[in-house]
UniProtKB/Swiss-Prot annotation:
This is Transcriptional adapter ADA2a. The middle domain of ADA2a is sufficient for interaction with the HAT catalytic domain of GCN5. GO terms for molecular function: DNA binding; transcription coactivator activity; zinc ion binding. One of its GO terms (biological process) is regulation of transcription by RNA polymerase II. A zinc finger (ZZ-type) spans 48-104. GO terms for cellular component: nucleus. InterPro entries: ADA2-like_ZZ, Ada2/TADA2, Homeodomain-like_sf, Myb_dom, SANT/Myb, SANT_dom, SWIRM, TADA2A_B-like_dom. Keywords: Acetylation, Coiled coil, DNA-binding, Metal-binding, Nucleus, Transcription, Transcription regulation, Zinc, Zinc-finger. The keyword DNA-binding applies. It holds the Pfam family Myb_DNA-binding. Residues 1-30 are annotated as: Disordered. Residues 365-386 form a coiled coil. The lineage of its organism: Eukaryota, Viridiplantae, Streptophyta, Embryophyta, Tracheophyta.
Length: 548
């Protein structure tokens, strides 16, 4: 049995872009209701075709078909095969296989043999845990049905890992088909029988009490569903379950969005960290290549004792690496590191820096001990900061607590205004270059970007006493410069961020045609022309500007 068609496979689109191997019924509420209404009028239910002819689009479910052994997922009906149909890459000279009717129960009465094969193919393709893709591959079963059937028929089988086939061994195909028909007759319910409240399906109450007017228009009445003459009650339940899933999907996709609390944070765990919440796995685990150690290892009867012991040692090493991977994942989940820390977000910039520096000790402490350590360290920082503020206030002449608090508040406000001005002027080097290029930080000698509290309390004559030697290494943007550019910045005393901004402005203006020679660039910057010349020469060296 070949694998069924999926719309996402490019190979199928090459063979026949306009046709799909499996006919899928849309899960929209309108289509789901229409499918139930059609089943009511016809007197029986129609299942989506598992296989279709690639040429005439005939439903081949339960019929003999011819499968090409060369082309991927290419099937033909008997009529098209008999006349030698050729389509795209498929030729009538290709080898083929005759695929017989497998619409009979093999393991359980509610699963046909072809559905069993599709289930195993899907698990082999998508792996365990991707049950939504597995259900889409099978086509005629829901995700819950696939999980339940695999667990009961395979995982809990007395013949594990094989299913229990004791009731089908030795029986012919006709006998299996007859058994399937008998099981269908036994599950049949009398026509026009009213279901009692206890026998009503769980979704009936939801269908009855649906408050939405649009959904009520498409929901068929329960009496109509219960009074339909069908072969069995199980297929009827599947249709209603599909309708419920359709309504849930519709509510999620096109319904009203649920209001979210202003303070509620929804971290994009999968996007940011590559973590799958449902499978509880990372896309890239710690020591992700650990399996390569024993990927090609094989135990043979001809192995000597030394070789066997060596392979066992490899297995022990691999086991330890798996234990370390598990320990790290449990550490991340236990400490809730995938989500933003509300306590960290409530801290100031300096306190947040201390918080991050203490994270390295988390591996040596329990969660409660580490949290207590961080609180104590931050409290110590706050106390020291308060002592420094009070000492500075006393030096300024404050004698009471209220005067000191007023002085500290004004100081904080002034620092905030200065930092705001620095951020506003950061993008325009020409506006502040003439005033701030007197120190390696791009600020006046009596101003520091982190405030006076981050500097030692020394007398003014001793501040920046070692600025005779200019070195831009370690400054912001220095890692983006070459050695030649760093040397030029040291010689001209230009900050790396200012140099990069000047390069950007000069490059854009040269491309616009505003700067055609070196002297045209002087008007764009409020710095010495010699510094502009050096930056312009660097552009000429890179082949951007004109040397004139």
């Amino acid at each position: 049995m070949g694998r069924s068609k999926l719309a996402s496979r490019p190979a199928e689109e090459d063979l026949n872009p306009g046709k799909s191997k499996r006919k899928k019924i849309s899960l929209g509420p309108e289509n789901a209701a229409a499918s139930i209404s059609t089943g009511i009028e016809a007197g029986n239910e129609r299942k989506p075709g598992l296989y279709c002819c690639n040429y005439c689009d005939k439903d081949l479910s339960g019929l003999v078909r011819f499968k090409c052994a060369v082309c991927m997922d290419f099937d033909l009906c008997v009529e098209c095969f008999s006349v030698g149909v050729e389509l795209n890459r498929h030729k009538n000279s290709h080898p083929y296989r005759v695929m017989d009717n497998l619409s009979f129960s093999l393991v359980t009465s509610d699963w046909n043999a072809d559905e069993e094969i599709l289930l195993l193919e899907a698990i082999a393709t998508y792996g365990f845990g991707n049950w939504k893709e597995v259900a889409d591959h099978v086509g005629s079963k829901t995700t819950t049905e696939c999980i339940k059937h695999f667990n009961s028929a395979y995982m809990q089988s007395p013949c594990f890992p094989l299913p229990d086939l004791s009731h089908t061994i030795g029986k012919s195909k006709d006998e299996l088909l007859a058994m399937s028909k008998d099981s269908a007759v036994k599950t049949e319910i009398p026509a026009f029988v009213r279901l009692s409240p206890k026998e009503e399906l769980p979704v009936s109450a939801e269908i009855k009490h649906e408050a939405s007017g649009k959904v009520n228009e498409i929901d068929p009445p329960l009496s109509a569903l219960a009074g339909v003459k069908k072969k069995g009650n199980v297929p009827q339940a599947k249709d209603i379950i599909k309708l419920e899933a359709a309504k849930q999907q519709s509510d999620r996709s096109v319904g009203e969005k649920k209001l979210r609390l202003p303070g509620e944070k929804v971290p994009l765990v999968t996007e940011l960290y590559g973590y799958n919440l449902k499978r509880e796995e990372f896309e890239i685990e710690h020591d992700n290549d650990a399996e390569q150690l024993l990927a090609d290892m094989e135990f043979k009867d001809s192995d000597t004792d030394a070789e066997r012991e060596q392979k066992l040692q490899v297995l022990r090493i691999y086991s330890k690496r798996l234990d370390e991977r598990k320990r790290r994942k449990e550490f991340v989940l236990e400490r809730n590191l995938l989500y933003p820390d509300q306590y960290e977000m409530s801290l100031s910039a300096e306190e947040r820096k201390i918080y991050k520096s203490c994270k390295v000790f988390a591996r040596f402490q329990s969660k409660e001990e580490h949290k207590e350590l961080i609180k104590k360290v931050i409290e110590e920082h706050q106390i020291l900061r308060r002592i420094e503020d009070l000492q500075e206030a006393r030096t300024a002449g404050c004698r009471t607590t209220s005067d000191a608090n007023r002085f500290i508040e004004e100081k904080r406000k002034k620092e905030a205004e200065e930092s705001m001005l620095l951020r506003l002027n950061h993008g325009a080097p020409g506006s502040i270059a003439g005033k701030t290029l007197k120190s390696p930080r791009g600020l006046p000698r009596n101003l520091h970007p982190f405030g006076s509290d981050s500097l030692p309390k020394v007398t003014p004559p001793r501040i920046y006493s070692g600025l005779d030697t200019w070195d831009v290494d370690g400054l912001l943007g220095a890692d983006l410069l070459s050695e030649t550019e760093k040397k030029m910045c040291n010689e001209t005393r230009i900050l790396p961020v200012h140099y990069l901004k000047m390069l950007d402005i000069l490059t854009r203006e040269i491309k616009k045609g505003q700067i055609k020679k070196k002297s045209d660039a002087y008007s764009f910057f409020k710095v010495e022309p010699s510094k502009v010349d050096r930056v312009y020469d660097m552009l000429v060296h890179k082949g951007i500007g004109d040397s004139t």
